Structure formats: structure tokens, C-alpha cells
């Protein structure tokens, strides 16, 4: 595999830039970090009500945030065929690439809270 041509480099740079911008748009939405924090700290296969309780988010906002996270493949939704039907959410492998960034944000917040 040789060096990239300038055009190839530009194309890859543009794709990376678009992905970063998309992620930042999603993460900056109201209650998004609360939802992700709930998913990270509460474990796998969380139900809507568990995420809602842990994230202090109303149903409408939570539905939007979960859909947005699903759209960018950060979470997946699993519909369990039971009566009544159950929907569970879990983080995907894609999340592992941004998990350290969110952990750093959490540590920053905790450090700031400890200084007050």
C-alpha cells in the first residue's frame, strides 16, 4: 500500500471531517450525554424505562435521542417478542471508539465537582 495521492488524502479527510461533525451535532443535543452516561454506567440491554429513569429525560426527548444514536450506529435496538413486547438498547462496537472521550468528559466533570 503506497502513499496517498493528494486527491485521495482530501477525500479521506473530508469523510473524517463529516463523521466528526455529525458526531458533535448528535452529542451536543439536549440530554444526549445524560442518555449515553446511563447506557455506559447501567450496562447492557437496558429498557427504555431504565434509561429514562437514569438519564432524567422525558419520554419524547429520550425517544429522539435513542433514534439519533441508533441512526449513527452508536446503539442498537433489540425488540424481544414477549407479551407485552420489550425493547432493549445496547451500545455497539462503534461506541468503543468514542468511549474514552466520554470517560474523559466524566472525569473532568467529577474533578470539577470535587473542587467546589
Regions found by a protein language model. Give the residues of each.
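Short, solvent-exposed amphipathic helices
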Residues: 97-115
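Canonical helix-turn-helix DNA-binding module
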Residues: 48-77, 84
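Basic, amphipathic "hinge/linker" alpha-helix immediately C-terminal to the N-terminal HTH DNA-binding motif
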Residues: 81-102
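Generic leucine side-chain signal with a strong bias for well-ordered alpha-helical environments
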Residues: 39, 62, 66-69, 91, ...
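N-terminal helix-turn-helix DNA-binding core of bacterial DNA-binding proteins
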Residues: 18-61, 88-90
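N-terminal leader segment of winged-helix/HTH proteins
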Residues: 1-27
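A cross-family signal for key residues in well-ordered alpha-helices
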Residues: 34-37, 70, 106
Amino acid at each position: 500500500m503506497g502513499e496517498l495521492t493528494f486527491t485521495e488524502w482530501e477525500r479521506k479527510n473530508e469523510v473524517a471531517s463529516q463523521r466528526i461533525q455529525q458526531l458533535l451535532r448528535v452529542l451536543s443535543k439536549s440530554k444526549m450525554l445524560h442518555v449515553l452516561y446511563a447506557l455506559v454506567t447501567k450496562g447492557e440491554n437496558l429498557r427504555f424505562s431504565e434509561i429514562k429513569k437514569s438519564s432524567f429525560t422525558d419520554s419524547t426527548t429520550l425517544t429522539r435521542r435513542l433514534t439519533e444514536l441508533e441512526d449513527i450506529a452508536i446503539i442498537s435496538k433489540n425488540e424481544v417478542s414477549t407479551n407485552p413486547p420489550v425493547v432493549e438498547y445496547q451500545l455497539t462496537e462503534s461506541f468503543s471508539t468514542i468511549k474514552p472521550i466520554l470517560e474523559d468528559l466524566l472525569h473532568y466533570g467529577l474533578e470539577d465537582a470535587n473542587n467546589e
